[in-house]
């Protein structure tokens, strides 16, 4: 145990350890009862919870909160009281964000320009660590684990949470090497395995048929829509659990946009997707849930159908109807 722990923290730590121990016993008993049923989904959730509570119970540092013990495992992310400032606290960009983002759903982030959508989505895989003058408070949990804790290294987080940017970002390499480079940088060296993953990733991004005969030609020779699908292929090559998409079709023509939207419908079968979009029509076409941001705050979150047909917040309605923007 670490030194210089105040008595109140130590007392809380011991109390929580007792609670975790009892919770493990309770969950193990529930697991035994479930083993005689066909409820496999619930059994998976119980196993996940047991695993997390055991990690919590073994934690020997009362001053570090690595996991969220009441995490809802229907969510891929849970955000608690998250704030972010730019320019050494000169600009308060995100204000008291509390939000749960569901697994295996497409969640659209909508709102006026400058409302915090892109700032928020880049927070989910710690892109702001690369920006000077940024400060943060609050917590972001990914599958119960605090993304800023020592137990979730930055490189591991970014392999699990892929990112696709507004404009296609191919490397100045061949189509093949655009994907292989990411694999090699994460320690995958076997050429047969790399070849397999490159093919699977391009197929997953609906690009294989377009490029299978030109794999070793420059990626810059592809059309804008093909380059964006290559960016998606590169993101899914590492088998992430989440895809973050920051206005992925804003630089594309309608035909290429339609192909990306069709691809999103396919990808959500395997990944949780968070997409920033300025297109209300696109949000309705591709998303299951919608979050409305306004002036750095989340004003409303619900199913996409509810947000677009019966919004609870007057500003949400004004934005959807085009009265604010």
From Swiss-Prot:
Name of the gene encoding the protein in the UniProt record: pstB
Origin species: Mycoplasmoides gallisepticum (strain R(low / passage 15 / clone 2)) (Mycoplasma gallisepticum)
Record EC number: 7.3.2.1
One cellular component term from this protein's GO annotations in UniProt: plasma membrane
Domain ABC transporter residues, every copy: 79-320
Name used for this protein in its record: Phosphate import ATP-binding protein PstB
Subcellular location: Cell membrane
Biological process annotations from GO: phosphate ion transmembrane transport
UniProt xrefs under Pfam families: ABC_tran
Function field: Part of the ABC transporter complex PstSACB involved in phosphate import. Responsible for energy coupling to the transport system.
Record's keyword terms, sorted: ATP-binding, Cell membrane, Membrane, Nucleotide-binding, Phosphate transport, Translocase, Transport
UniProt-listed InterPro entries: AAA+_ATPase, ABC_transporter-like_ATP-bd, ABC_transporter-like_CS, P-loop_NTPase, PstB-like
Principal location: membrane
Complex and partners: The complex is composed of two ATP-binding proteins (PstB), two transmembrane proteins (PstC and PstA) and a solute-binding protein (PstS).
Family: Belongs to the ABC transporter superfamily. Phosphate importer (TC 3.A.1.7) family.
Membrane topology: Peripheral membrane protein
SMART domains registered for this protein in UniProt: AAA (SM00382)
Gene3D superfamilies, sorted: P-loop containing nucleotide triphosphate hydrolases (3.40.50.300)
Gene Ontology molecular-function annotations: ATP binding; ATP hydrolysis activity; ATPase-coupled phosphate ion transmembrane transporter activity
Catalytic activity entry: phosphate(out) + ATP + H2O = ADP + 2 phosphate(in) + H(+)
């Amino acid at each position: 145990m670490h030194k210089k722990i105040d008595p109140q923290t130590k007392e809380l730590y011991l109390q929580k350890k007792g609670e975790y121990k009892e919770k493990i016993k309770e969950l193990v008993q529930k697991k035994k009862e479930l083993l005689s049923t066909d409820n496999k989904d619930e059994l998976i959730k119980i196993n996940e919870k047991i695993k997390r509570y055991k990690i919590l119970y073994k934690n020997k540092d009362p001053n570090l909160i690595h996991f969220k013990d009441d995490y809802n495992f229907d969510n891929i992310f849970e955000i608690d009281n998250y704030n972010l400032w730019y320019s050494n606290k000169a600009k308060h960009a995100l204000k008291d964000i509390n939000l749960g983002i569901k697994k295996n759903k497409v969640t659209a982030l909508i709102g006026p320009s400058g409302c915090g959508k892109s700032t928020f989505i880049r927070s989910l895989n710690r892109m702001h660590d690369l920006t000077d003058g940024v400060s943060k408070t609050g917590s972001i949990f990914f599958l119960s684990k605090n993304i800023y804790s020592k137990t979730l290294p930055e490189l591991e987080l970014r392999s699990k949470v892929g990112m696709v940017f507004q404009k296609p970002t191919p490397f100045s390499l061949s189509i093949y090497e655009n994907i292989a480079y990411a694999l090699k940088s994460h320690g995958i060296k076997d050429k047969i395995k790399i070849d397999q993953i490159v093919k699977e990733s391009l197929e997953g991004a609906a690009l294989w048929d377009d490029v299978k005969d030109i794999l070793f030609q420059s990626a810059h020779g592809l059309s804008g829509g093909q380059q964006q699908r290559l960016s998606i292929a590169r993101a899914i090559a590492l088998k992430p659990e989440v895809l973050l998409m920051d206005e992925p079709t804003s630089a594309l023509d309608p035909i290429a946009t339609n192909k990306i939207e069709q691809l999103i419908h396919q990808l959500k079968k395997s990944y949780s997707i968070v997409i920033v979009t300025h297109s209300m029509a696109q949000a309705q076409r591709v998303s299951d849930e919608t979050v409305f941001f306004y002036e750095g705050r989340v004003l409303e979150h619900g199913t996409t159908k509810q947000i677009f047909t019966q919004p609870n917040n007057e500003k949400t309605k004004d934005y959807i109807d085009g009265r604010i923007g």
